[in-house]
């Protein structure tokens, strides 16, 4: 990993270059066949290989009493990306489609991301936030080259005065490539409020306040199958949660030392 930084007045310029390995999950490698629906089977491919991912990130940061801004430009390349693959077969004298995986040619994504925080009173009383990005995704596999746009957008407002506080966060979902499908971001419409007295905090949370929870996905373009899914949970609009917490460490000196950082990047994911 390469990291270079140049300090500016009220900000900085940073250049990062990183690389990593993406390992296939155990379910991606398993030859066990499962029935999704009659006529559609799902099976892993033990011949799928791990892929390498690398690319540069250029980031600009600005910070003063009223404004915090971060803008990034990036380009990430993945060789032999793991992508879905479909073919026809005969199971118990019936024609069926098998959904499996293969190593495609490449996956290339590039674009820009941004985050803006504005404090009109130059303190924590009121904060306005917006963030998002514009990303171009290019995937090349057995079915040709596919190009998509991903443009997430999120926003929020925080209020804090004395012992009271409240916030609201929302977003506009956009679809991005996730292994098998192009999946939409999870919709977000969350409200929270709290009152804090010493170590005690009393909270109220509301999720999906103005819209139901909605999850969408669509298979990549291919000549064999077009699969679209949509799940809507309307009851979540009435979800409210009350919370009471006590901080036993409030006002106490904390001295924590981290001795071990053990991370298993090759952990399997059973489905």
Please tell me what each predicted stretch does:
Residues 22-28, 69, 78-86, 125-127, ...:
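Outer-membrane beta-barrel proteins
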Residues 13-15, 56, 69-73, 110-112, ...:
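Transmembrane beta-strands of outer-membrane beta-barrel proteins
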Residues 8, 17-23, 32-33, 54, ...:
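Transmembrane beta-strands of outer-membrane beta-barrel pores
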Residues 9-54, 75-94, 211-226:
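Surface-exposed extracellular loop regions of Gram-negative outer-membrane beta-barrel proteins
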Residues 43-45, 49, 62, 68-130, ...:
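Outer membrane beta-barrel strand-and-loop segments of large Gram-negative receptors
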Residues 197-271:
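C-terminal beta-signal and adjacent terminal beta-strands/loops
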């Amino acid at each position: 990993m390469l990291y270079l930084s140049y300090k500016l007045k009220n900000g900085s310029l940073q250049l990062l270059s990183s690389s990593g390995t993406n390992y296939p999950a155990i379910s991606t490698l398993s030859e066990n066949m499962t029935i999704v629906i009659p006529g559609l089977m799902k099976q892993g491919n033990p011949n799928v290989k791990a892929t390498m991912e690398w690319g540069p990130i250029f980031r600009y940061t600005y910070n003063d009493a009223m404004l915090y801004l971060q803008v990034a430009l990036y380009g990430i390349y993945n060789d032999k990306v793991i992508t879905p693959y479909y073919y026809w077969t005969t199971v118990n004298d019936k024609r069926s489609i098998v959904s499996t995986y293969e190593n495609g040619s490449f996956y290339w994504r590039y674009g820009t991301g941004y985050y803006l925080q504005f404090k009109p009173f130059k303190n924590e009383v009121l904060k306005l936030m917006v963030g998002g990005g514009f990303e171009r995704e290019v995937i090349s596999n057995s079915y040709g080259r596919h190009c998509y746009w991903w443009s997430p957008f999120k926003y929020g407002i925080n209020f804090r005065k004395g012992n009271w506080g409240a916030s609201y966060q929302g977003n506009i979902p956009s679809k991005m490539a996730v292994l098998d499908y192009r999946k939409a971001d999870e919709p977000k419409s969350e409200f929270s409020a709290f009152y804090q007295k010493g170590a005690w905090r009393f909270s109220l949370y509301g999720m999906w306040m103005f819209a139901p929870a909605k999850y969408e996905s669509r298979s990549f373009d291919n000549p064999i199958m077009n699969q679209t899914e949509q799940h809507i949970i309307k009851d979540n609009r009435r979800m409210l949660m009350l919370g009471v917490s006590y901080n036993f460490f409030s006002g106490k000196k904390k001295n924590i030392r981290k001795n071990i950082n053990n991370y298993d990047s090759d952990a399997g994911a059973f489905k």
